[in-house]
């Protein structure tokens, strides 16, 4: 309530994550310096869990998307069919996408599996730029790579996934 007092991190409503606090801190510094502050959108902050089997998500869940009025299709691919996961012996888990049926916009993404907290960045980029499932399915990923599982999940939207 005071113009000259700012709060970030665990003091504010939202995700209590280091990368969220850092983004808010940069926003505050830019505001104080009279620069155009970076936009910090809560829905574009990744949620990451650093456990043996990592988990990460960004955006809306299926339930949240439906509650917001979207007609959604949920796709999923498993790491069991991913060459890199098989080579590394880390083939547990999946990638799940929540997609708006009408426009193909990627509304949310959920990953449980190897390096999920690294992979989520690509899905954040697509979501934050309002990318479509069609664009995501057209990306030619390196092979072998865990990122190929993203393409598989995108291809599942069109019933054209081949490694499932």
Residue ranges and their predicted role:
Residues 50-164:
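Flexible, glycine-rich terminal cap/loop adjacent to redox cofactors
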Residues 1-34:
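FAD-site-proximal beta/loop scaffold in flavoenzymes
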Residues 31-58, 142:
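Active-site-proximal substrate-binding core of FAD-dependent oxidoreductases
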Residues 23-26, 30, 47, 60-67:
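Internal, well-ordered alpha-helical scaffold/interface segments
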Residues 1, 45, 91-93:
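A generic structural signal for well-ordered coil/turn residues at beta-strand boundaries
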Residues 2, 41-43, 101-102:
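Short, flexible turn/loop "capping" segments at secondary-structure junctions
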Residues 20-24, 41, 115, 128:
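Short acidic-hydrophobic sequence patches enriched in Asp/Glu that either
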Residues 9-13, 46, 138:
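Short amphipathic alpha-helical segments at helix-loop
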């Amino acid at each position: 309530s005071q113009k000259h007092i700012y709060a970030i991190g665990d003091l504010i409503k939202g995700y209590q994550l280091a990368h969220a606090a850092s983004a808010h801190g940069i926003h505050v510094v830019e505001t104080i310096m009279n620069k155009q502050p970076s936009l910090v959108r809560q829905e574009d902050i990744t949620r990451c869990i650093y456990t043996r089997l990592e988990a990460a998500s960004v955006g809306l869940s299926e339930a949240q998307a439906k509650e917001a009025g979207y007609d959604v299709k949920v796709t999923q691919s498993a790491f069991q069919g991913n060459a890199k996961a098989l080579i590394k012996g880390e083939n547990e888990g999946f990638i799940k996408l929540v997609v708006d049926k009408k426009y193909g916009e990627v509304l949310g993404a959920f990953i449980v599996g190897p390096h999920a907290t690294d992979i989520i960045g690509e899905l954040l980029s697509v979501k934050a730029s309002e990318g479509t499932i069609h664009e995501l399915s057209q990306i030619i990923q390196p092979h072998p790579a865990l990122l190929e599982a993203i393409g598989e999940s995108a291809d599942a939207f069109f019933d054209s996934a081949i490694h499932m």
